[in-house]
């Protein structure tokens, strides 16, 4: 900052009323916080806070595993690190980031005199311009930053208020005029209620002097995030500041930035063929037999056949059909173990439309971890909502009244930075989605609430009579039966002791293995469904291609066309009995329907069979039956009705004739005779 020898007053500040509008705008956006798009706020990422120089190169960084927007460490880069590849007056314009402290050391230090030293660090310091290229200059810089009459001040960059137009740009280190500074270590102690950071020294004067004498970076800063900075979610793009030394003459300065990096966000979707349909593998085909190769003919010998030795090949990845078959196979084994009467003969059906999974609320004991476990970093983007959870279980957080019916026990968590991990075979169903573990920091900072649930695939159980009746030619419409899902049949299996292997003996061990197979199949299918949803959300292809991304519907269509399942309404059904799951379910369905048809025909009489064997005869009879009945009624009751009608007409005619004759004659009065 260009400055005369006049004292610099801290009174020339920006009027606080000028900051009122930006402050209101900031408070209005304060609640607009979100985690990574499409992810759970409790998901743990590998977070890295980076401090950059004026060329946007990283010169210092710190990493940790935490949920987004919950970890705000103190950043401690050295002041000279910010000057690497920076302005020439710092003496480090040719030094790359992460370089060691350059220049000759002092001639005295903790290790004694050093060869090639430049000056004695113990001699009195002069008022030379502080630089970073030697140990002597870094010691002088330490004197400036710790002296009460000198120091440094920091001015915000692009995120400053619009009214601060006089603060300039990077050329003036965002400090072109007084009043632009918001933090620093100078005697007037600048401050701000809206800036994102505060900057101070991280070492005392005596500590810094000793480190400088040892030819190390000896001017570390302490950058702390303010409450306003902790509410901002734009750190991934970076924010920038300018720093200037408060010395006599022209104040030297530099610019630096702070940005956030986080990993484990999933694969990026390239522009091109849609990856959702890329792994639609067909059913495995048998490998062709190797062709015999003839050996070179030898003299006086017959040719011999030599079979080439098979070369080991890696098994192909599991296709969509195999994945869904594994899911149904695991469901069958778990059902056969717990309810063997249900698997005498049954059909297990996969639904083609969402939801593909349902949850059962359970009670369980979660584990408490001070550091994030490995499974907390697993991406959890499953679209299960609390409206699809049944039962009563363990709840955490502030549960609204509309969902308190799911809670048998509600726990309030204490403040702190720790993680709650769900027991094996369960997960947390929160109002933000599914997650294997919860962050106490996120729960205390938000209004999130969660329920401990078991996840069960939406596999529908049907008795054989219902399935066969849907494929038979029946003219009677029966009432739709109540569908039983796997969650209703096996709900509470995990916390009931089977998954944990409760008990001793073979039964408990087998039960654990059966459930683990189902659990593994569920996890594989959830990953594929999640991948399809992610690709669908990020797809840049045409609408017709997006419509084809109904992954589960396509998977079931492939199974149906391959004869592996029977299509029943919107479900793909597999036949199962005590021998196991039948892969060729369509052949089994045809066989059972043929058997039922023969049994039905054998129990019918010749008259009923006539109607079943001649469909045209049924149509003919139903067409002429009405006219024939009417004609028969006419023949039976027609003569009687006709006679009655004729007699009635005759009677009326006779009455009319009598009336006519009566009108032509007059009645004579009787004569009276006198005595």
Curated annotation (Swiss-Prot):
Alphabetized Pfam families for the sequence: TLV_coat
An annotated GO cellular component: membrane
Transmembrane stretches, start-end: 621-641
Coiled coil: 513-547
Annotated region (Fusion peptide), positions in chain: 482-502
Signal sequence interval, chain numbering: 1-34
Lipid attachment residues per UniProt (S-palmitoyl cysteine): 640
Immunosuppression as annotated region, ranges: 548-564
Motif (CXXC): 346-349
Residue interval(s) of motif CX6CC: 565-573
Compositionally biased tracts (Low complexity): 296-308
Residues reported to bind Zn(2+): 89, 120
Record carries keyword Nucleotidyltransferase: no
GO biological process annotation, one example: fusion of virus membrane with host plasma membrane
One GO MF term: metal ion binding
Ranges of Pro residues composition bias in the record: 285-295, 309-318
Chain intervals for the UniProt region annotation (Disordered): 276-323
Protein purpose: The surface protein (SU) attaches the virus to the host cell by binding to its receptor. This interaction triggers the refolding of the transmembrane protein (TM) and is thought to activate its fusogenic potential by unmasking its fusion peptide. Fusion occurs at the host cell plasma membrane. The transmembrane protein (TM) acts as a class I viral fusion protein. Under the current model, the protein has at least 3 conformational states: pre-fusion native state, pre-hairpin intermediate state, and post-fusion hairpin state. During viral and target cell membrane fusion, the coiled coil regions (heptad repeats) assume a trimer-of-hairpins structure, positioning the fusion peptide in close proximity to the C-terminal region of the ectodomain. The formation of this structure appears to drive apposition and subsequent fusion of viral and target cell membranes.
Subunit: The mature envelope protein (Env) consists of a trimer of SU-TM heterodimers attached by a labile interchain disulfide bond.
Protein's name according to its UniProt entry: Envelope glycoprotein
Protein encoded by which gene: env
């Amino acid at each position: 900052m260009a400055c005369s020898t006049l004292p610099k007053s801290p009174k020339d500040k920006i009027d606080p009323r000028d900051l009122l509008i930006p402050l209101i705008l900031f408070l209005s956006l304060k609640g607009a916080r979100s985690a990574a798009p499409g992810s759970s706020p409790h998901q743990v990422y590998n977070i890295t806070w980076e401090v950059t120089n004026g060329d946007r190169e990283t010169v210092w960084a710190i990493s940790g595993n935490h949920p987004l927007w919950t970890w705000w460490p103190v950043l401690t880069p050295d002041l000279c690190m910010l000057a690497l590849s920076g302005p020439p007056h710092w003496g480090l314009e040719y030094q790359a980031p992460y370089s060691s402290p350059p220049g000759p050391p002092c001639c005295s230090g903790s290790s004694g005199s050093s060869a090639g030293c430049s000056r004695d660090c113990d001699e009195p310091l002069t008022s030379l311009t502080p630089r970073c290229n030697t140990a002597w200059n870094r010691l002088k810089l330490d004197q400036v930053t710790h002296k009460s009459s000198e120091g440094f001040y920091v001015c915000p960059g692009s995120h400053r208020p619009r009214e601060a137009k006089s603060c300039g740009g990077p050329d003036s280190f965002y400090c072109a005029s007084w009043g632009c500074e918001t933090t620093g270590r100078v005697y007037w102690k600048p401050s701000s209620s809206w800036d994102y950071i505060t900057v101070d020294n991280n070492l005392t004067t005596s500590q810094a002097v000793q480190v400088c004498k040892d030819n190390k970076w000896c001017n570390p800063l302490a950058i702390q995030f303010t409450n306003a900075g902790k509410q901002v979610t734009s750190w991934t793009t970076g924010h920038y500041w300018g720093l200037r030394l408060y010395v006599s003459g022209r104040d030297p300065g530099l610019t630096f930035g702070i940005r956030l990096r986080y990993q484990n966000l999933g694969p990026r979707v390239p522009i091109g063929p849609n990856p959702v349909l890329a792994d639609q593998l067909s059913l495995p085909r048998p490998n062709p037999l190797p062709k015999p190769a003839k050996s070179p003919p030898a003299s006086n010998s017959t040719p011999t056949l030599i079979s080439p030795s098979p070369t080991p090949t890696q098994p192909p990845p599991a296709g969509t059909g195999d994945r869904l078959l594994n899911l149904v196979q695991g469901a069958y084994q778990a059902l056969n173990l717990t309810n063997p009467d249900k698997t005498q003969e049954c059909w297990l059906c996969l639904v083609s439309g969402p939801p593909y999974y349902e949850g059962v609320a359970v009670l369980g004991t979660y584990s408490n971890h001070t550091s994030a476990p490995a499974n907390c970093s697993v991406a959890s983007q499953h679209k299960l909502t609390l409206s699809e959870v049944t039962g009563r279980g363990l709840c955490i957080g502030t549960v609204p009244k509309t969902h308190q019916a799911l809670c048998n026990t509600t726990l309030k968590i204490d403040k702190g930075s720790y993680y709650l991990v769900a027991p094996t075979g369960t997960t947390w169903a929160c109002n933000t989605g599914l997650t294997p573990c919860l962050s106490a920091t996120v729960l205390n900072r938000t209004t999130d609430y969660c329920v401990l649930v078991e996840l069960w695939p939406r596999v529908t159980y049907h008795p054989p009579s219902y399935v066969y009746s849907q494929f038979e030619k029946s003219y009677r419409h029966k009432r739709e039966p109540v569908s039983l899902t796997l969650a209703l049949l096996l709900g509470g299996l995990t916390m009931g002791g089977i998954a944990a292997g409760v008990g001793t003996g073979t039964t408990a061990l087998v039960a654990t293995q059966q459930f683990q197979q189902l659990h593994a199949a569920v996890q594989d299918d959830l990953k594929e469904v999640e991948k399809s949803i992610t690709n669908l959300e990020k797809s840049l292809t045409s609408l017709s291609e997006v419509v084809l991304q109904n992954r589960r519907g396509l998977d079931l269509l492939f199974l149906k066309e391959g004869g592996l399942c029977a299509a029943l309404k919107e479900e793909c059904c597999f036949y199962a009995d005590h021998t196991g799951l039948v892969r060729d379910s369509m052949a089994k369905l045809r066989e059972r329907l043929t058997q039922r048809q023969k049994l039905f025909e054998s129990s019918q009489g010749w008259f009923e069979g006539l109607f079943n064997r001649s469909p045209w005869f049924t149509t003919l009879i139903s067409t002429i039956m009405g006219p024939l009945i009417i004609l028969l009624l006419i023949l039976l009751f027609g003569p009687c009705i006709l006679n009655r009608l004729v007699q009635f007409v005759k009677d009326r005619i006779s009455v009319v004739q009598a009336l006519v004759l009566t009108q032509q004659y007059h009645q004579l009065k009787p004569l009276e005779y006198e005595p």
